[in-house]
Amino acid sequence: MSKGTPSQGKHNKGSNHIICRRCGRRSYHVRKKACSACGFGASKRLKTFAWKNKKINGQRVR
């Protein structure tokens, strides 16, 4: 096994985020056990911010 820069490229396999059960987005962090989009796993309340979604026709979109 070699170490150094060539072996650092092998760290990009796999993904930390899977599909969230609550919001359906690919934002559920497997190791943290929390969704970065809706807050599932970390909070009972839905994680929402005004800056997170752009207004279209006066309505917020997901």
UniProtKB/Swiss-Prot annotation:
Record's GO cellular component terms: cytosolic large ribosomal subunit
GO term, biological process aspect, one: translation
GO molecular function ontology, one term from the record: rRNA binding
Zn finger limits (C4-type): 20-38
Transmembrane segments: none
InterPro entries (alphabetical): Ribosomal_eL37 (IPR001569), Ribosomal_eL37/eL43 (IPR011331), Ribosomal_eL37_CS (IPR018267), Ribosomal_zn-bd (IPR011332)
Note on how the cofactor is bound: Binds 1 zinc ion per subunit.
Keyword terms: Metal-binding, Ribonucleoprotein, Ribosomal protein, RNA-binding, rRNA-binding, Zinc, Zinc-finger
Binding site for Zn(2+): C20, C23, C35, C38
Cofactor or coenzyme needed: Zn(2+)
Function: Binds to the 23S rRNA.
Stated family: Belongs to the eukaryotic ribosomal protein eL37 family.
PANTHER family, A to Z: 60S RIBOSOMAL PROTEIN L37 (PTHR10768), RIBOSOMAL PROTEIN L37 (PTHR10768:SF0)
Protein name: Large ribosomal subunit protein eL37
Species of origin: Methanococcus aeolicus (strain ATCC BAA-1280 / DSM 17508 / OCM 812 / Nankai-3)
